[in-house]
């Protein structure tokens, strides 16, 4: 049982390492054009987030875990709103205060 658990964590470590290294090599060797590169990085990021939620936070879609999953999703949405709002404010400040 204990050995099986360690093998699972080792597999997840290798999987997440590959998902981290793939975008770096895609940038260095210019495998994709710029738009496809952004999409590739976002897809790798999405799969990393799902793997962390599933395997390290041990969350799933069962009824017992539903409220924990909802709280994680809510936290991600609030963080995304704060991030995008900050980018929007800084971009508008740059456009409005730019000296021509």
From Swiss-Prot:
Which superkingdom heads the taxonomic lineage of this protein's source? Bacteria
* Mode of membrane association: Multi-pass membrane protein
One function term, GO molecular function aspect: cytochrome bo3 ubiquinol oxidase activity
**Key word Transport present in the record?**
yes
Please give the residue ranges for the topological domain Cytoplasmic.
1-9, 60-68
**Entry similarity comment:** Belongs to the cytochrome c oxidase bacterial subunit 4 family.
Under the heading InterPro entries, the entry gives: Cyt_c_oxidase_su4_prok (IPR005171), Cytochrome_c_oxidase_bac_sub4 (IPR050968)
> Hey, which stretches end up on the Extracellular side?
33-36, 91-100
Source taxonomy: Bacteria, Pseudomonadati, Pseudomonadota, Gammaproteobacteria, Enterobacterales
Task: Print the keywords alphabetically.
Answer: Cell membrane, Electron transport, Membrane, Oxidoreductase, Transmembrane, Transmembrane helix, Transport
Give me any GO biological process, just one. aerobic electron transport chain
What is the protein's known function? Answer: Cytochrome bo(3) ubiquinol terminal oxidase is the component of the aerobic respiratory chain of E.coli that predominates when cells are grown at high aeration. Has proton pump activity across the membrane in addition to electron transfer, pumping 2 protons/electron.
Q: What is this protein called?
A: Cytochrome bo(3) ubiquinol oxidase subunit 4
One Pfam family name is: COX4_pro
PANTHER family in the record, alphabetically?
Answer: CYTOCHROME BO(3) UBIQUINOL OXIDASE SUBUNIT 4 (PTHR36835:SF1)
Known partners and oligomeric status: Heterooctamer of two A chains, two B chains, two C chains and two D chains.
This protein's GO cellular component annotations are:
cytochrome o ubiquinol oxidase complex; plasma membrane
Q: Where are the transmembrane segments?
A: 10-32, 37-59, 69-90
Q: Where in the cell is it found?
A: Cell membrane
């Amino acid at each position: 049982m204990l050995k099986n658990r360690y093998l699972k964590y080792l597999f997840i470590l290798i999987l997440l390492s590959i998902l981290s290294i793939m975008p770096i090599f895609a940038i260095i060797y210019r495998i994709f054009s710029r738009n496809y590169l952004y999409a590739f990085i976002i897809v790798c990021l999405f799969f990393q987030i799902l793997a962390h939620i599933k395997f390290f936070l041990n969350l799933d879609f069962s009824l017992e875990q539903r409220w924990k999953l909802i709280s994680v999703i809510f936290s991600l949405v609030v963080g995304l709103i704060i991030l995008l709002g900050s980018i929007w404010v800084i971009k508008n400040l740059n456009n409005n205060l730019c000296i021509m």
